[in-house]
Every structure is written in C-alpha cells, then in structure tokens.
C-alpha cells in the first residue's frame, strides 16, 4: 500500500509540475485571426477519376505488395475522395474567397480522408461553412476546430551532443534499456539477428524535437517526415519532444547507454497532434496520418496518442462510445489490420482521473493496446483500464512504463512515465517478430503475441492478456510456419 501511495503522490506532483511549466510559457495572439475547420462526410465516391484496378495512382508499390502478400483485396474505402465532389467544393470556396474581405482568412481545403470519405475545410465564414454542409453530396457536417485566442511562443531547445559519463553502464550492452526489453524476452530475438530490419514503422505523435540533430538518431533509419496539423509547424523539429522520447525506445542504438527494441527498422515521423488545443480535428489528423502510412507501405503504426475530452466540449464522448467504431479515430484505427498493418496504441494515462478507462483509439478492433507496468510488474495506477463497451479485452498487453528509459529532446538519458512509452517498446518488438516471421499476416501477428502473453488464459480489465513473451511467440510462430 505504501509503495502505491508513493507512486500516486509522485505522479500527482509530476503532473502539477508539468501543468505549472506549461502555464508559464509566453503567449502570442493566434496568427490569422478567428477561423474554423469543419468536417464534411460525403455521401459516396461517385464522380471520381480513380478506379480500384489502378491503385498505383495513389498507393506505393510497397503498399500494394503488402496487401498482395497478405491476400487483402482493395475495396471502396481505399479509393480517394471523389475528385468531382472536391472540384465542386473548390468552386464554392473560390466564389466565397472572391467576396471575402482581405482582412479575413481565405477559405480552403486542408485535408481529406479516403477511409472515412471526409473533407476538412477551413474558413472564417461560418455562413459559408453551413451552406457547404447543405450540398446534396454532403451526408454530415460538424465543426471540429475553432482557432484559439492565443498560442504559446515557440522556444528553441538546444540538444546535447554527448552523453554524460554516468549515462554509460559499462558491461551492460543495452545500457539503461535492458530491463524494458528483457521483461518482454525481446533481447533473444536480437541475439539471433532480428532487430527490425526491413520493417517500416510509422510513428504518429505530436513532435520530434531535435531528432534531426541529436547524435543518437543520426544513424537511425529515418525514411521521412510529414506534418498533418493545420497550420503546419514552421519548425518541424522544434515541436514537443514527446515523439523523440517515443522514437528513442525503438530506434536508439547506443551500446551501454540505450539500445531500443528495433534499431534496424525504418521510421516515418508523422506529426498529427496539435499541442496548442485539444479538439476533434485531431482525430482527422490522426486518420490522415494513418492513411499516409498505409500509402507509403508501412508495416506497423505506433501511436502514443489518446483522446476522451476536448476543450469547451464537455460530454463530447461517453464511456459507452468505447466500441471501436463510434469515434472517427477508433473507426479508422480498426481498419489498419484490414489494410495489412499492425497498430500498437497506448492505453492512455486516465487511470487516476474520473475517466479511468482506456482512451480513443485504444478501443479499436484488431489492434494491440498497451498499458504500463512498474519494475515489479504491477500496473501503474495511471494506466487506463478496460474493457471496451462491447466487452472486448483491453488493454491487450502490458510493458514497462513506470518508468521507462528514454532519450529526451535535449539528447539526455532520462526516465519518464506513461503508456506513451510502454507502447513503442512493444511496437519495436512487433517489428522484430514480423521480420522473423515474414509469412504471417497482420491479424496472425496480433493474435500470436496475445496468445504468448502470461495472462492469456485469464485476462482481466487491468492487465489484459498480460506481459508478452516475444521469444516464445517466435518459437511457436516458427513451428506453425513449419507445419
């Protein structure tokens, strides 16, 4: 009891410190004035110039091959949003902009989702936005973002180019990351050469501070970056370091300091979390990032993001909505396995608050939701619990996250707490396992990992199926391949 109370007090003090720090940052008036983003769900995909027999027009060769290898056919959700409807919207926008005062922000399309058949439109003119929602080809419309009055001024953070002498653990190859990989028996996959080579992981996060200059990442296989947040950051690598920490648990390769769980994998860094506000449009950004990951041929999506409440929108979601399909973000997440990808998503850190449960999209079907354990393999009190509204086991897995060893945006070795970090630790080992068992499809990999977790026969709402054993998953998976 004493240890749990101490942990609770520590977490509460940490959250208070973070909130106090955020409150003290300098502010500036939101650039461009008051404007809004509305989401329009279209009726269908008629009047389109795209056809399912020519997917190479919008999907990469790697994406098409991934589906072909897993026997997954294309369907109507894969088709881009109707080019005919987009042209109609663009004509309406052009007419609206011609009558707009120069002091106002011009209207424009800022994104689409082919899986959800939606379009995002930004404008300062709410009359125009409502009129657009009345068009025959629009099924539903909703305001999903409102410009804040002010935002924080960006403060550039310099990175360290060398580790401190005490960061090195002589004679310990994995350095400070030893416990988090050994808890999952993943080091044994590394020992026989499976370190994620040939696997592409898309990291969906809010920022990757200094990943372009921290020496640790200079030798990582970072294939590319993309920003889905409106407006795009003027300095992609100076946003929050949350994604930097996440990436380090997988991609770091610093012997005796920190070796991540998939140092040989390839990574795409996709920014889809807006740090300035918490609004429903972030679900759209996440969906656009997930679809982009699909189109470039990613094998795994790791996401340490979760939502359950939004600014000035009390009651937007209820716990009964945790069914994997009500929230746009969860509905999108539930489609990843159908496209041949494995989603590894954090359970969320709401366990100590009034919500307590997992957050969206941790309720997604056919995904691996990860909670956090402490070093004694006891669940962290902040880790979100299940089950889903339709009584599926959640979280699926547990891993070290209270605390985990990471590299911060300053390039320093630190320990931090959250399901945000237990999640990529697992995602990296999913990459290693899939490298070792390339004949498996996404659903088979997901089920294999669940089945080789230590509570598979007696899952509950706190630990899910328990702690996965990736070495045993490999051994069992290899046996089934040989049959």
Positions of the model-derived regions?
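Hydrolase catalytic cores
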Residues: 247, 270-274, 357, 397, ...
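Catalytic-core environment of secreted peptidases
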Residues: 214-223, 372-421, 457
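Solvent-exposed loop/turn segments at secondary-structure junctions
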Residues: 45-47, 116, 128, 147-149, ...
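Bacterial Sec-dependent N-terminal signal peptides
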Residues: 1-29
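Primarily auto-inhibitory N-terminal propeptides
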Residues: 22-102, 120, 127-130, 136-151
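Subtilisin-like serine protease catalytic core
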Residues: 177, 187-226, 232-282, 296-299, ...
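Substrate-binding/access-modulating region of protease and related hydrolase catalytic domains
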Residues: 253-256, 269-363, 409-423, 461-462
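Autoinhibitory propeptides
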Residues: 88-181, 187-190
């Amino acid at each position: 009891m004493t240890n749990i109370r101490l942990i609770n007090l520590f977490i509460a003090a940490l959250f208070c410190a973070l909130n106090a720090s955020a409150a003290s940052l300098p502010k500036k008036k939101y650039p461009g004035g008051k404007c809004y983003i509305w989401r329009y769900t279209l009726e269908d995909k008629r009047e389109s110039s795209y056809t399912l027999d020519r997917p190479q027009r919008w999907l990469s060769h790697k994406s098409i091959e991934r589906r072909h290898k897993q026997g997954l056919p294309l369907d109507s959700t894969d088709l881009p949003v109707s080019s005919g409807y987009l042209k109609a919207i663009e004509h309406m926008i052009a007419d609206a902009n011609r009558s707009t005062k120069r002091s106002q922000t011009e209207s424009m399309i800022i994104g689409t989702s082919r899986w959800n058949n939606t379009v995002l439109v930004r404008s300062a003119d709410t009359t125009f936005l409502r009129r657009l929602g009345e068009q025959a080809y629009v099924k539903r419309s909703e305001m999903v973002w409102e410009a804040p009055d002010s935002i924080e001024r960006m403060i550039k953070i310099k990175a360290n180019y060398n580790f401190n002498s005490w960061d090195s653990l002589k004679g310990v190859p994995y350095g400070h990351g030893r416990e988090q990989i050994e808890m999952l028996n993943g080091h044994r996959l590394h020992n026989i050469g499976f370190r994620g080579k040939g696997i592409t992981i898309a990291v969906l996060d809010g920022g990757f501070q200094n990943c372009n200059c921290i020496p640790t990442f200079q030798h990582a296989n970072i294939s590319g970056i993309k920003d889905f947040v409106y407006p795009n950051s003027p300095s992609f690598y100076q946003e929050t370091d949350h994604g930097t920490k996440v990436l380090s648990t997988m991609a770091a390769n610093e012997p005796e300091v920190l070796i991540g769980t998939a140092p040989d994998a390839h990574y795409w860094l996709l920014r889809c979390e807006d740090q300035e506000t918490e609004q429903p449009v972030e679900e759209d950004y996440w969906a656009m990032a997930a679809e982009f990951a699909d189109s470039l041929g990613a094998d795994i999506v790791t996401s340490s993001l979760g939502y359950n409440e939004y600014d000035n929108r009390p009651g937007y979601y209820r716990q009964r909505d945790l069914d994997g399909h009500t929230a746009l973000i969860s509905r999108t997440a539930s489609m990843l396995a159908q496209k041949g990808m494995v989603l590894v998503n954090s359970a969320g850190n709401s366990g100590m608050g009034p919500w307590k449960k997992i957050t969206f999209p941790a309720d997604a079907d056919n995904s691996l939701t990860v909670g956090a354990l402490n070093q004694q393999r006891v669940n962290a009190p902040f880790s979100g619990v299940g089950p889903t509204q339709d009584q599926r086991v959640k979280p699926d897995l547990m891993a070290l996250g209270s605390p985990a060893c990471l590299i911060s945006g300053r390039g320093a070795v630190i320990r931090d707490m959250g399901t945000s970090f237990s999640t990529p630790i697992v995602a990296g080992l999913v990459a290693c396992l899939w490298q070792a068992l390339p004949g498996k499809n996404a659903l088979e990999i997901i089920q294999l990992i669940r089945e080789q977790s230590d509570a598979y026969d007696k899952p509950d709402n706190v630990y899910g199926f328990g702690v996965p054993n990736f070495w045993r998953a490999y051994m069992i998976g290899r046996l089934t391949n040989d049959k």
